[in-house]
């Protein structure tokens, strides 16, 4: 579903940061200021968000993986919820340095988590002493919190979707190093450099974050549905061709 200007206004997407904290590189996307707060030009944001959705749609249609990143308190739950709805990996607790640039190490931790989860399923906890079980539960909880959202990510993602580039500077830097496209919400106090698909907007409002994350998840689901429809249509076309030549 396409996001409208009205939805953006209602979610407060246009509210930037205090003028004294601004990044001059965001000047092209700023409409003006009110009460020492920068106002983002939604006439720029809307088409840029639409472009980002279009890219996401195409990537999803080609079975691409998009990693959702949002670890701030106001975005944590939404990021997990929308990524799961779209069947995509996510990081919503803390970005561990090297999550992409040192994927081999991450794979070791993922294997450990999966082995531990399998042990729980097999009833191994019941065979442990109280102390062993407690330490085991603590470790599995820690792993689930830090890497649970990426445990089914088979490799480096095809793109990352980030809410707040300043807060997730390491994630953006890692993506840039590997040539992984970055789709990101950039507020008036940060630089849009290193971002392939810039979404100029408020990165603090939970309503705004929900709007972006839902929009990206919707685009992923639409892209997948379109790909399935194309396969069905192609199969029908082949059937008709066979009948005509029978």
From Swiss-Prot:
It comes from the Bacteria. This is Small ribosomal subunit protein uS2. Signal peptide: none annotated. NCBIfam families: rpsB_bact. Belongs to the universal ribosomal protein uS2 family. Gene3D superfamilies: Glucose-6-phosphate isomerase like protein, domain 1, Helix hairpin bin. GO terms for biological process: translation. GO terms for molecular function: structural constituent of ribosome. SUPFAM superfamilies: Ribosomal protein S2 (SSF52313). The keyword Iron does not apply. Keywords: Ribonucleoprotein, Ribosomal protein. GO terms for cellular component: cytosolic small ribosomal subunit.
């Amino acid at each position: 579903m396409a996001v409208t200007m009205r939805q953006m206004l209602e979610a407060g997407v246009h509210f930037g940061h205090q003028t004294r904290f601004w990044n001059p590189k965001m000047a092209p996307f700023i409409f003006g200021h009110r009460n020492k707060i920068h106002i983002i030009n939604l006439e720029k944001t809307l088409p840029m968000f639409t472009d980002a959705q279009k890219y996401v749609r195409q990537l999803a249609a080609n079975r691409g993986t998009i990693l959702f990143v949002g670890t701030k308190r106001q975005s944590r739950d939404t990021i997990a919820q929308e990524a799961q709805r779209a069947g995509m990996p996510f990081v919503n607790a803390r970005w561990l340095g090297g999550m992409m640039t040192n994927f081999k190490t991450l794979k070791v931790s993922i294997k450990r988590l999966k082995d531990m989860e399998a042990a729980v399923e097999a009833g191994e906890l019941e065979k442990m002493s109280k102390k062993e079980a407690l330490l085991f539960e603590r470790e599995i909880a820690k792993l689930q919190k830090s890497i649970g959202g990426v445990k089914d990510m088979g490799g480096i993602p095809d793109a990352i979707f980030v809410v707040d580039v300043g807060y997730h500077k390491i994630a953006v830097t890692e993506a840039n190093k590997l040539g992984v496209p970055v789709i990101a919400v950039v507020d008036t106090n940060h630089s849009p450099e290193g971002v392939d698909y810039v979404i100029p907007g408020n990165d603090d409002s939970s309503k705004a974050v929900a709007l972006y994350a839902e929009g990206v998840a919707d685009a992923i689901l639409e892209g997948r549905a379109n790909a399935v429809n194309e396969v069905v249509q192609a199969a029908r076309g082949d059937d008709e061709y066979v009948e005509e030549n029978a």
